[in-house]
């Protein structure tokens, strides 16, 4: 295989530079050494790669095919070399990032672009989690790092975590929903009369639960907050939504915010990671997320106690 790789490199340089002399300078070898290497492969395989009948060697059809396919091989080999070096330095081959469904994924797009500009050898895989499902993905080994997780972190030294801030939630209904006309603050007895729209917990351990669902309250359980938002706008139910997700619909009048007795508006939000398996890619994402001003803005409180968005 090594002689073939050498020939592929020679053919690539020859086509780019135009002559054996120029190619030899690029490869730091003599023209005769390059010519001998190519000729030996031709002899071993009983093929002709170059037509040497003219002043300059020209590629035969076989030579052009080997050049074209060979460049793909060279690219793969070079990427493999870079990947091996990066892995040796501590960069993961793959990084699985669990993203809680309440987290605004669009804020990760600039970080993905920045990461791949310099660290393309690490493949990124994103998975979704809801409520306890985000922590579950981390503790069960399905994710290397999670972002936007709510509720309390696990009490194990295997995992590290840092608080991103607080997620503000608002109780919202459509203007034509019966609760829109009820006097504020709404009490639980009144809310319980109407169907809730909830997002199901994706935790695998134990029974899954739905957040802020009252006892014996009728509910539709959906798989993400985008669907929950759509159903509440349609008037099919009521419930809490992240303020950043609901705000433009509150501003347009598609939703109405209602105050609720003894409501908890802010939920602590975390980033967590596996201390045992964390490499350089995990560290890069942890640092960038914690330093990102746009992400901080989603989870920051303003002076009036509301989300800073």
UniProtKB/Swiss-Prot annotation:
Homology family: Belongs to the LysR transcriptional regulatory family.
PROSITE patterns the UniProt entry points to: HTH_LYSR
Keyword set includes Cell inner membrane: no
Domain of life: Bacteria
HTH lysR-type domain boundaries: 1-60
Keywords: DNA-binding, Transcription, Transcription regulation
Encoding gene per record: yeeY
Disulphide bonds in the chain: none
DNA-binding region, residue range(s): 20-39
SUPFAM superfamilies: Periplasmic binding protein-like II, Winged helix' DNA-binding domain
Listed GO MF terms: DNA-binding transcription factor activity; transcription cis-regulatory region binding
Protein name as it appears in the record: Uncharacterized HTH-type transcriptional regulator YeeY
Source taxonomy: Bacteria, Pseudomonadati, Pseudomonadota, Gammaproteobacteria, Enterobacterales
PANTHER family: HTH-TYPE TRANSCRIPTIONAL REGULATOR, LYSR FAMILY TRANSCRIPTIONAL REGULATOR
GO terms (BP aspect): regulation of DNA-templated transcription
